[in-house]
UniProtKB/Swiss-Prot annotation:
UniProt entry keywords in alphabetical sequence: Cytoplasm, Molybdenum cofactor biosynthesis
GO CC terms in record: cytoplasm
Protein's UniProt name: Sulfur carrier protein FdhD
Cytoplasm recorded as keyword: yes
Gene designation: fdhD
Pfam families: FdhD-NarQ
Length: 265
């Protein structure tokens, strides 16, 4: 299986009243089956990059691990599309439902008892970070220009973690949840504290994305799109500042505006 994030493929295009042969970039979908302690845990449809980060972040998001020390080993066999994970503990009965799930690239899991299962992992933010409007606009501009593949295909989600000035990590994936899990895995691997960091995201802030941000532990999430009503409710409850519709030099603050300060003051 080809491991490129995107591939040039021949197509027929219609333009200016004519049909002609050309090439176009397609994003790659890669099925990765995650085995935990020898048992099939889930299959994730993803972009074939930063797979170890993805696996670690996904397991942390699911509550299977809470810290790096719980991982004994992670072996990625990308030639066969498997990730073999050994933990220093048993998963326990509550993860029996998780076996043999297929997590599509286009959407969340839409699983039963979603909020009950995630409530124990999502964190109420204690972040003290503050941002100026210029910082917010600059971070979104940088995110949008960071990926040439997104500019070529329009088919990848981009996400980054920043302190307001510097991007600590930038990741991309065909799945919006995967992009965030890669960030999460990166931070867990390196023991990076994200409480006073910002999550910058190219997609819409849905309730699932907001909960994912809470699991990662950030206090601010920025998006070029608007959030959903449930996402705003959760952001208020979890003390997360949600900023959306960042474009053309403006933006909307949907929750906890106290973290955004006027640069003129």
């Amino acid at each position: 299986m080809n491991k490129d994030v995107s591939l040039g493929q021949p197509i027929v295009r219609y333009e200016d009243g004519k049909l002609f042969n050309t090439t176009d970039q397609y994003v790659t979908e890669f099925p990765l089956t995650i085995m935990v302690n020898g048992e099939e845990f889930a299959t994730v449809i993803c972009s074939p990059t930063n797979l170890e980060e993805l696996v670690i972040g996904f397991l942390a998001s699911e509550g299977a691990i809470l810290k790096r020390d719980e991982l004994k080993s992670v072996l990625i066999d990308d030639s066969k599309g498997f990730a073999h994970v050994e933990l220093n503990k048993d998963l326990g009965d509550r993860f029996q439902y998780s076996t043999k799930r297929m997590i599509a690239s286009c959407c969340g899991k839409s699983r039963e008892f979603y909020f009950q299962n995630d409530a124990a992992i999502a964190k109420t933010s204690m972040s003290k970070i503050t941002l100026t409007p210029i910082q917010i606009i600059n971070m979104m501009t940088r995110l949008q220009s960071a990926s040439h593949i997104y500019q070529e295909t329009g088919g990848l989600h981009n996400a980054a973690i920043s302190d307001g000035l510097t991007f600590f990590v930038h990741r991309q994936d065909i799945g919006r949840h995967n992009a965030l899990d890669k960030l999460y895995g990166f931070c867990i691997q390196r023991h990076i504290t994200v409480r006073d960091k910002v999550l910058i995201f190219s997609g819409r802030i849905s309730s699932e994305i907001l909960i994912k941000a809470a699991k990662i532990g950030v206090g601010v999430i920025l998006s070029k799109s608007a959030p959903t009503t449930l996402a705003v409710t959760l952001a208020n409850d979890l003390n997360i500042t949600a900023v959306g519709f960042i474009r053309n030099g403006g933006f909307n603050i949907y929750s906890h505006p106290e973290r955004i300060i006027d640069s003129e003051q």
